A protein has these predicted regions:
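NAD(P)-dependent short-chain dehydrogenase/reductase
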Residues: 152, 159, 164-195
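Alpha-helical substrate-binding/gating segment
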Residues: 178-186, 194-228
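NAD(P)H-binding glycine-rich loop region in Rossmannoid oxidoreductase-like domains
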Residues: 35, 41-92
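Conserved Rossmann-fold NAD(P)-dependent oxidoreductase catalytic core, especially the SDR/UDP-sugar
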Residues: 91-135
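N-terminal Rossmann NAD(P)H-binding glycine-rich loop of SDR-like oxidoreductase domains
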Residues: 3-23
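Glycine/proline-rich active-site loop of Rossmann-fold NAD(P)-dependent oxidoreductases
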Residues: 142, 154-156, 167-176, 211-221, ...
């Protein structure tokens, strides 16, 4: 199977490349600079340009493009950059893949975020059928996903991964969260009762490969633990795993003052479930918060 990656140098893209290379699969990547090897192809998504040769023989394209939501503050120009970087990469990838039709079955695995649903206001979980919220990040994910439509219209099988924070020591959220805990300064965020979506890197990589090889998989999938986990439960699991106490708490007011809107993503209650993955028979290797923390500390990149 031949794969094309956009965003291959980031945390998740690097993990995908390592996994696929270990299996002997063929991987080519899109770069914004002059290509340095025969496995690199240039593109400029902000200008809507892409080297169409990148799609030659490709079975699966994975689009992870987009600048990080951090750093703060979310100024108007930063908001525009966060949105444009996602919509432009997705639109350029989707239109290029659509224009390169060669009669073969092809798949686009498109990144998105669990932030589409906003915070939880009731006891019912968010599923893939739940409507998008109205806040800034929810609007970003809605436009992000819509930008992949040209590929679907051209007959490409499009799988949208609404991903929660992917936990692993090699990068992302967990790499930042574990540092204060290792120093004995870990803390519960807010009152700790808020549900906190997450998935291990090991399971994230498994979902990507499942999406690539499951011919009837299409549309959105929530990537989060099948068992809801609170921030306090995550703190307990991490404290136990690194043999450190949990006695500190960061009040919600301090977080809101320091982080502004982003604080809502950390102290807001988010209850989403991977309904479609479970219904389609996907089996999580790390279904509980204790499993996720253990896997993250071992670092799935080495697996």
């Amino acid at each position: 199977m031949k794969w094309l990656l956009a965003g291959a140098s980031g945390f998740l893209g690097t993990a995908i490349r390592i996994r696929l290379a270990s299996e002997g699969q063929q991987v080519v990547r899109l770069v914004r600079r002059e290509p340095a090897t025969s496995t690199e192809f240039s593109w400029d998504p902000d200008a809507g340009r892409i080297d169409m040769a990148a799609f030659d023989g490709v079975d699966v394209a994975v689009n992870l493009g987009g600048v990080p939501v951090a750093p703060l503050p979310w100024t108007e120009s930063r908001r525009e950059q966060i949105l444009a970087s996602r919509v432009n990469t997705t639109s350029t990838m989707a239109r290029g893949f659509a224009a390169h039709a060669d009669g073969r079955p092809r798949t686009l695995i498109q990144a998105s975020g669990i932030a589409r649903y906003g915070t939880t206001s009731g006891s019912e979980p968010y599923t893939e059928e739940s409507p998008a919220a109205g806040d800034y990040l929810a609007q970003v994910t809605t436009k992000w996903e819509a930008a992949a439509q040209p590929a679907a219209d051209a007959g490409v099988r499009v799988v949208i991964l609404r991903t929660s924070p992917v936990m692993d020591s090699s990068g992302g959220t967990f790499a930042l969260l574990k540092l204060p805990w290792l120093c004995g300064l870990g803390a519960t965020l807010g009152d700790g009762s808020q549900r906190m979506p997450m998935i291990s890197l090991r399971d994230y990589l498994a979902v990507v490969q499942w999406a690539a090889t499951t011919e009837d998989a299409s549309g959105p999938y929530n990537l989060t633990l099948p068992q809801p986990t609170t921030n306090a439960e995550f703190a307990d699991a991490l404290a136990a795993a690194v043999h450190r106490p949990r006695f500190l708490r960061v009040p919600a007011g301090i977080m809101q003052t320091a982080l502004g809107e982003l604080a809502g993503q950390l102290i807001g209650d988010m209850y989403a479930v991977p309904q479609r993955l479970v219904a389609n028979g996907f089996v999580f290797s790390d279904p509980t918060v204790e499993d996720v923390v253990g896997s993250a500390l071992r670092s799935a990149v080495r697996h």
